[in-house]
From Swiss-Prot:
This is Ficolin-2. GO terms for molecular function: antigen binding; carbohydrate binding; carbohydrate derivative binding; G protein-coupled receptor binding; metal ion binding; pattern recognition receptor activity; sialic acid binding; signaling receptor binding. Disulfide bonds join C104-C132, C111-C139, C263-C276. Belongs to the ficolin lectin family.
Amino acid sequence: MVLGSAALFVLSLCVTELTLHAADTCPEVKVLDLEGSNKLTILQGCPGLPGALGPKGEAGAKGDRGESGLPGHPGKAGPTGPKGDRGEKGVRGEKGDTGPSQSCATGPRTCKELLTRGYFLTGWYTIYLPDCRPLTVLCDMDTDGGGWTVFQRRIDGTVDFFRDWTSYKQGFGSQLGEFWLGNDNIHALTTQGTNELRVDLADFDGNHDFAKYSSFQIQGEAEKYKLILGNFLGGGAGDSLTSQNNMLFSTKDQDNDQGSSNCAVRYHGAWWYSDCHTSNLNGLYLRGLHKSYANGVNWKSWKGYNYSYKVSEMKVRLI
């Protein structure tokens, strides 16, 4: 059916009115050619309201795992946890070989060396023997220039010096009082170079004197700690040791003297007895004058055989 001109005009007006009325919300208008000059304008309506949400679909199959991402920055450390229980004690390992001693390599060998290092106080120090064995010794840093290693001291009679061979070999006594350093130690000390000897004595009236020798050494146990003594250099106490030079050491249980009887037993000491002695500094502590003969702390050349000294110290110093 072909619309007349009047009808088309009316329809055009209606469409235009509708288009103007809805221009604010649905502006899209399409014009289609019909035939010739007759055109039909078609208005596209506004979209309708969204429909209701459909039901949720089923989950798809699990995909392949993706590649790991870059590591993140480390987080802050958390608070320290409580201390755990102590574990069981492990098995003790085998004892290793003894390594070289740094102290032996650089440590002092004598009291004189300690003095040169700036140790000026008399007292007990650790030195190192030639075999690297540490030894605690009394260093006299005051007498005659200092640097003396004391190996015998008698001061009050609190220590028994009438002892056997093993005791004199190992040493005995107290750092606080009287002692014998031990023949093995004295041997080790006196075989490292030349050592001078000083004997200091004091009586019970406050008098002090000494005797000094150019060298002093004792040999090892195999040689019965034989005494090798140098020349007497002087001192008001006189020389009461030269007669013991080249003698072997004797104790109450090992008689190595040149007498017919055991001088150590006879004179209650231990010494380098010949037949028998002119000194007995390891004898009985008899406190001054005594009626018994030559069995005290005796040094004949100063006060004879019937006087036992209050103080006796024997000491060596490396020359």
